[in-house]
Amino acid sequence: MTFVVLLTSAAIRATPGVMIVPLEKEFGWSRAVISVAISVSLLLYGLIGPFAAGLVNRYGPRRVMALSAFLIGLGTLSTVTMKSPWQFIALWGVLVGCGTGITAIVLGATVVQRWFHVHRGLALGMLSASSATGQLIFLPILAQIVVTSGWRWAVVAVAAVALVISPIVFLVMRDRPQDKGLAPLGLPPGEPVPAPAVGGNPVVAALSALKMASRSREFWILAGSFFICGASTNGLVGTHLIPACMDHGIPEVQAAGLLAMMGIFDLIGTTGSGWLSDRFDNRLLLMTYYGLRGLSLLYLPYGFVSEGHGLSIFAVFYGLDWIATVPPTAALARQAFGAEKSPLVFGWIIAAHQVGAALAASSAGLLRTVEGNYDHAFLVAGFLCLFSAIGVLFAGKRPPAPVLSPQTG
């Protein structure tokens, strides 16, 4: 059920990519103005995450996810009546941003912490892959609806999904395995089930976690790398790739299909990343992911003008590590701050991710308005990813090598 809610939230976060050009044409709004609303939504998605972790500890995932789906559906549906940019900012930016923020990746980390004793990296990788799956399922359909029936019907479709899911989550989901007479997956027989976190004031809990984490070098390295991660994914490619494709004469449905193709490879890459994060040095994994992403973004401006399968090559290599950074980053946070505190700290790392996404979404929209293309935005993001590939090597310590007992004859 968590996967379904995160999938729906991810699909709605990706929807503006197919709305930018139709909104430009209908209302005459500039791409920079439209990007402001998207930036606000991305920013709130991140900033609410740490407090959402506190809400989950106090009220449980079931109530929190049901509320999130309702807010997402309400905010999305309300945009069909908007007439001016401030309404788009208030509805999509604020209301939808708050709703998706409650279902930030930190929610998946909290659920994994409760339901899994082993294979946590793999489980988080599968939940993180919901973003890829959301694009895979929804974006080509939404693009086709926009082309044939207009952007309003596309919005109604995703709003309906969210509003239907909300009561189902409330009625069906359970907060922890004990509620169903189960133990966390892989918990050894006879070992006591970890006590759930004590519910308290979510604001105090989130701010206390930030105060504690901010004294750590690992926090700033992980938050800084995730800032660049957000800028180079949700903020830039997730928001502006479809409009950039249309600038080069690629039809909207075909451009959405490119994102869906990336979603297929990201589903593979992120799930595989979760498996790898349980077994290998997570810093080396992050170095590989950011390096591959940086090279892909540096190639993208040339992919637009190359003949043949230039964009397909980009989609494969960029897609493989789009959200693959989540499991190793969460694992490093858990290693640095412990199982109990890491979900709240990871919430602040997600906040940094979305601050980067918001800045990239607005900056790329402004660059497109001023320069007429996105080339510099893609190139800057590529170099930042290469910088991050080096920086993550300084996070944490290498896991100690296993000590082998001498064999006796």
Say what each PLM segment does.
Residues 23, 102-116, 324-337:
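Intracellular juxtamembrane helix-capping segments at the cytosolic ends
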Residues 48-61, 270-281, 368-369:
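Helix-to-loop junctions at the C-terminal end of transmembrane segments
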